[in-house]
């Protein structure tokens, strides 16, 4: 029985992947057209264990709408406790994230894309920010959350 429990725990860690398509996530997106891609299985908060890449981020205009697109790379929906995807932002590399949007997991299949518009917040400081997406599984047989981040530069409105 212990062997079965350990095997199920191992399997749970391989389910429920998420990748951020737009803006491009930190690191690579190797193999994302196949369910279960390693680049979509990052469980270390707040950014999947990937370091900032501030000189590679895209520029966003404060106060404008921007479409964030994520991929549910591998489904882990549980009808009795459905999860969600959150889109969050913080200035720079430190501090608290502020939730900008939430998408409910309705049991769409692996490789499904989700897009939502956010209003880019006005920067308080130097304009560099971290955009974070989190897949909150709410499934006790899986990791609680999967993380991706993108580095962005927020430009003030003229």
Model-derived regions, located:
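Serine/threonine-rich low-complexity intrinsically disordered regions
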Residues: 1-2, 61
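Cleavable N-terminal signal peptides of Sec/SRP-targeted secreted and luminal proteins
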Residues: 2-16
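Structured recognition/catalytic domains enriched at protein termini
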Residues: 15-158
């Amino acid at each position: 029985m212990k062997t079965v429990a350990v095997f199920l725990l191992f399997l749970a860690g391989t389910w429920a992947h998420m990748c951020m398509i737009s803006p491009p996530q930190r690191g690579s997106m190797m193999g994302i057209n196949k369910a279960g891609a390693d680049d979509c299985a990052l469980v270390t908060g707040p950014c999947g264990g990937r370091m900032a890449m501030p000189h590679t981020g895209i520029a966003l205009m404060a106060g404008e709408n921007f479409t964030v697109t994520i991929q549910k790379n591998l489904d882990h929906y549980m009808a009795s406790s459905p999860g969600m995807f959150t889109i969050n932002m913080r200035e720079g590399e430190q501090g608290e994230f502020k939730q900008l949007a939430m998408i409910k997991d309705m049991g769409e299949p692996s490789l499904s894309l989700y897009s939502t518009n956010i209003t880019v917040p006005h920067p308080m400081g130097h304009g560099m920010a971290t955009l974070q997406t989190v897949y909150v599984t709410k499934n006790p047989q899986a990791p609680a959350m999967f993380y991706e981040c993108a580095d962005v530069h927020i430009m003030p409105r003229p």
